[in-house]
Amino acid sequence: MKKNIIAGFNVTCVGDNKTFSFLPSKYGSTLADKLAKHVLKYHVDKVKYYSFLDRGSDERQYCSPGVDLPVVSIMRSKYGTYREYHTSLDNMSFISAKGLEKSYQIYTKCVDILEKNKKYKSTTKCEP
C-alpha cells in the first residue's frame, strides 16, 4: 500500500463554519503537506496551523512508525478544540451545508492539482 500512496487526506471535522485547520504529516514536507498548504493559502482567508504533535485522529495510525504514509488533515474546527466535540451537542445542528460545501471545494482543489501534477521523463539519450 505504501508504495502506491503519494498523498493522502484524513477527512475529519469538515462540516462546521469555523476557521479551517491544518495538521501536517509526521514529516511536514510530503507532497500532501505542500499541496494542502498551497490550496489553503490561495483559497481560504484564515487557517489555523497545528503541529503533528497535536494529532489525535486517524492520522495517528496512518503516520505511525512502520506505516509512515504521507497523510495530512484539512479540517474546519480541529477535533478537541470546540466545546461540542464528543458531546451530545456534536450533532447535525453543528454542521452546515455551507461548511461542508467549502470543505468539499478545498478537497476537490487538492485532488485536481494532484491529478495534474506530472513528472516528465525524457525517453531519449542526450538532446532530442
Language-model region placement:
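Secretory-pathway/membrane protein signature
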Residues: M1-P128
